[in-house]
Each structure stands twice: as C-alpha cells, then as structure tokens.
C-alpha cells in the first residue's frame, strides 16, 4: 500500500494535523507554518492522490479519512480547509477519541446547494468535472482564481496558491474527479450535530465558494461550535490574513491546556 506524504515539524505537546483543499497540497500552509511551529507539533499532509501522495485514484470520503488516520498521531487537533474540512470532519465522526478539537476553514458540511441550503450549484460542480477532462490545468487555475476573488490581495494570493500547485506533481485527473464527487454529494450536517470535542469554524466573508449565509444556519444547527468570520478574506483566509488566522488557533490551544 502506498504511504501518503507526511511531514512533522515544530514543537509542543499539542499536535495539529493540517489538511489542504481540492487540487492543492501541503505547500499551501507555508505562509502560516512559521507562526504555528513554535506552538504546535505540525503534521503537514498531502491527501491521497495530491502533491507527493501519488498512486491513488478516486476515493470516497470515508476511505480518504481512514487512509489519513493510519499515519496520524494518536491524538491531535485536526484542521481542514475546504475539501480538507470534510476529511477532518469525517475523521472526527469516525474516531472522536483521536480528535482533541476540530477546526474547519472555508468549509461546508454540504458544499452543493440544496433546496433548503446555500452552496455551489450542482451543475457548476458537474461542469468542473466535465472541464477537467477537456483542459485539466486550466480548470485547476480557474478554481484557484475563484478562491481569492474579491480580496485586496487577490492576485498575490492566487499566485501563492498557483505556486503551491505548480511546485509539485499535478494531482491525477482521477483524484481530482473523486474530490469533486465528494464536494457534489456529501452532506455531513446531521452527522456533526453531536460532536463531543471543541469545534471551531473559520470563514471568509468574501468567499465565493462557501457562502457566508451558511454561518448563522450552522450556528443554529451546531450551537456548541464557535464560528469566526474574517471580514476581508475570501476562500483562503490563511493566505490573505495569516496573523489574524493564527490567533484563534493559539487561543484554542490555550483552552485545551
């Protein structure tokens, strides 16, 4: 069985596993690892099929979560961005005793819009799947541009994300398609209602992929969780506002003792 790429850096008895989003890899965290590494032992992961974790095709959300768990420390804070937020959430559902706290970033338990739920139109996600087979690299680049749109530093932020993608092998079309299928079909809203661990949700007000309308809906659905909305950030708040992004993570660590 292939191992997934996993790097451990930093110091501190609190372990923090960082899971990236669709199409990307662990390089996206470069802008915050210096701030966090003096407080946490960081676990930087390329999800199966992405970056340096080649040799994986399309996987279900459960299979991806299980694969990451196999290499993870016995206990950690799990932080997932976008698609990575679904993987971290699935880990918390499957093995709650291994998750000290769950942090989701610009993520939704249900990315696709439903009758009663704001999200990405399913036909947009299906369109991305179609475009992937036509023009792989351009589709990924379009998706990256969408993630930073609207912020004051949009161009620079998109460049940082693009650099993270281009610096490593491109994910396979199968892995990318599998990730879009997860975004199109998964709905964890009810499964996350009774999580036993602290649950922190971070959002960008200008996010074009995860609408801010879901924030109060999830505040009602998960009253035990805490939400923070970064006013001038879009889908990648850790890239546009690294210092502000790290503050709630350090506060969470203090609370966990």
UniProtKB/Swiss-Prot annotation:
Domain AB hydrolase-1: 15-241
Domain of life according to the entry: Bacteria
Broad EC category: hydrolase
A GO molecular-function annotation: pimelyl-[acyl-carrier protein] methyl ester esterase activity
GO biological process: biotin biosynthetic process
GO cellular component annotations of the record: cytoplasm
Subcellular location: Cytoplasm
EC code(s) of this entry: 3.1.1.85
Subunit structure comment from the entry: Monomer.
Function of the molecule: The physiological role of BioH is to remove the methyl group introduced by BioC when the pimeloyl moiety is complete. It allows to synthesize pimeloyl-ACP via the fatty acid synthetic pathway through the hydrolysis of the ester bonds of pimeloyl-ACP esters.
Protein name (database record): Pimeloyl-[acyl-carrier protein] methyl ester esterase
Organism encoding this protein: Klebsiella pneumoniae subsp. pneumoniae (strain ATCC 700721 / MGH 78578)
């Amino acid at each position: 069985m292939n191992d997934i790429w996993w790097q451990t850096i930093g110091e501190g008895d609190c372990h923090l596993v960082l899971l990236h989003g669709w199409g990307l890899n662990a390089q996206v965290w470069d802008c915050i690892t210096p701030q966090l590494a003096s407080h946490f032992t960081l676990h930087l992961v390329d999800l199966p099929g992405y970056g340096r974790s080649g040799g994986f095709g399309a996987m279900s959300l459960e299979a991806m979560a299980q694969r990451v768990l196999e290499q993870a420390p016995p206990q950690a804070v799990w932080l997932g961005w976008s698609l990575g937020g679904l993987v971290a959430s699935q880990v918390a559902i499957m093995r709650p005793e291994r998750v000290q706290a769950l942090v989701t970033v610009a993520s939704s338990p249900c990315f696709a819009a439903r009758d009663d739920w704001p999200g990405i139109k399913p036909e947009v996600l299906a369109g991305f799947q179609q475009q992937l087979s036509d023009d792989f690299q351009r589709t990924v680049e379009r998706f990256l541009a969408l993630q930073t749109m609207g912020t004051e530093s949009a161009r620079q932020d998109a460049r940082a994300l693009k650099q993270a993608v281009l610096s490593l092998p491109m994910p396979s079309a199968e892995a990318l398609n599998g990730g879009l299928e997860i975004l199109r079909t998964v709905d964890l809203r009810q499964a996350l209602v009774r999580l036993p661990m602290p649950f922190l949700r971070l959002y960008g007000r200008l996010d074009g992929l995860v609408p801010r309308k879901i924030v109060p809906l999830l505040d009602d659905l998960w009253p035990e969780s805490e939400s923070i909305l970064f006013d001038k950030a879009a889908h990648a708040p850790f890239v546009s506002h690294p210092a502000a992004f790290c503050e709630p993570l350090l506060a969470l660590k203090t609370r966990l003792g």
